[in-house]
Amino acid sequence: MNKLKSNFILNIVILFTILIFNINFINCENQKQQQHQQQQQQQQQQSSSTTTTLPIYSIKFSSETGFTIYSGNDSTSIAQSGFSNEMMTMGWAYLTITTNSQFEDSLQAEAAGYIEGYLTFEMIWQCWYNILVNEYQNQTIPNQVLNWANENIAYMKQQVATNENDPYWINIGLVLTQLSGMVDGYNAANQDPSRQLSFLDFILINMDADLGDISSTFNQSTSFSEISNFKKSMDHIKKTDHCSGLIKLTDDLTELYSAHTSWSSYINMLRIFKSYNFKFSSITNIKSKLTLFSGYPATIASLDDFYLLDTKLVVLETTNGLNNNDLYYLIKPESVLTWMRVIIANRLANGGQSWCETFERENSGTYNNQWMIVDYNKFVPGVKVRDGTLFVLEQVPGYIEFADVTNVLRTGYWPSYNIPYFETIFNMSGFNDELTDSSDYEAYEEDARSQIFRRDANKVYSLTDFQAIMRYNNFQNDPLSHGDAANQISSRFDLNSPDSQDYDAFGGVDSKVTSFSLVNQLLVIAQSGPTHDQEPPFQWSSANWSNIYPSIGMPNLYDFGWVNFTDISYNY
């Protein structure tokens, strides 16, 4: 009898336990479903705002008159472009260019550059002025810099001429042609002779991120004294140029987010979100015709970097930098700079592996970054994350390493915060010398942003959550910041004490986010300016910043919201 009673009680306990488990499981699934529905509603709301109507221009060419730009969307023209400068209303300008496959590739590229230079000429001059005054300290650019750039251009042109059947060099040639067209378009629109710019000037703007490492190759003897001030400026840029990146897989596998927050001097907040849709012929072997990216006046690469491609690849990077002077001798003009190699890799790749293999060619050893390539073709919502979804590549002079790191992503997220992931790159970059008190793993894992991502990344359930983490800065109340506004996902060096060593108009200057759902719409959501979620908006007129840093073309107050960008329109 007692045995029967005991069995009865045991069965009751088991049934009760199963019941509680099922209730908890159902509640958990309901919660996930609600979160997923909320996420979908947010994305629908993000993409359902009133779309702004862009003025459209077309461009044609004749041997007698050259290029002519006229109003209207002429499908028989070489290219059509829409442009609107909304810097004062949303913190971005927007540019879209589509070329016509009926014309030769070189004419498409030149026309695309020309119409961009023509339509954006005012912003290009503003960008050049800000760079000249702030980065070059209004001095003549040193001959060593100009000579290096000219040697690099000559090398590429020679390779283009020699390898006329190689898609890699064919596309390098088209990039140079596009930039040459932009120079001509800019100078045609600019009526002030004192503001004429050369092809080399445009090259210098595009190679701005590479210049920090190039300047470190110059001999520092007294015979090169003219380099001194320039190099000090470039060393500062290289030392402080960082970003935050995050790839986040939701717990229920229904969504995969990708985002990037650029860190830069606030002088670089003159922004254009760009869409290039180039219809080049099969000889170029391009896989991606359409590129949507966050950029700047006069640049044909992102430089942040953040790209959404029509091949459903998302490409982003954060800067690792180089703390090892022993590698600078490997940086030679006989190479292709990073800003151009990423364009070629974007065009020629059909996945993470091929992107890395293309980017690996002609390593310049400059602008040494951690690159993340997210292949949304490999992602099956709610089912699995297939191998090849996330590739990571890291570079130093003379060496590149890459790997499929999807297994790391399967644990929930991949963070990026300016410390190399691969041990060989970590050691070659000199991080082992900089961080002698801790092991490589500890240095990688215990960075402030690493700890913030570890604490907060798995709390991301929706698009709104994801946007918030990329704009996060609560340094006064977050113990992980140690009271430093720089130790946050979106830094604000300007909020540190004026007495501190790193007090400056520098920090996170934007955020760009996308996801599986948004990639299928060719949609990126972006916000311009320093974060103001938990902190006050940045204002040039405060703390005398406008007297320290000329910032023509920019609004005084950066309190803008998020903007939706597609390949043909934007809304906010």
Curated annotation (Swiss-Prot):
Biological process annotations from GO: phosphatidylethanolamine catabolic process; phosphatidylinositol catabolic process; phospholipid catabolic process
Q: Where is the signal peptide?
A: 1-28
Annotated Gene Ontology cellular components are: extracellular region
Main location group: secreted
What is the annotated localization of this protein?
Secreted
**Enzyme class, spelled out:** hydrolase
Sugar attachment sites are 73, 138, 219, 427, 544, 564
Keyword Nucleotide-binding in record: no
Q: So where does this one cross the membrane?
A: none
Could you tell me the keywords of this UniProt record? Glycoprotein, Hydrolase, Lipid degradation, Lipid metabolism, Secreted, Signal
Claim: Isomerase is one of the keywords in the record: no
The EC number on file is: 3.1.1.-
- What are the protein's GO molecular function terms? phospholipase activity
Function of the molecule: Probable phospholipase.
The family note in this entry says:
Belongs to the phospholipase B-like family.
Identify this protein by name.
Phospholipase B-like protein B
Gene name of this polypeptide: plbB
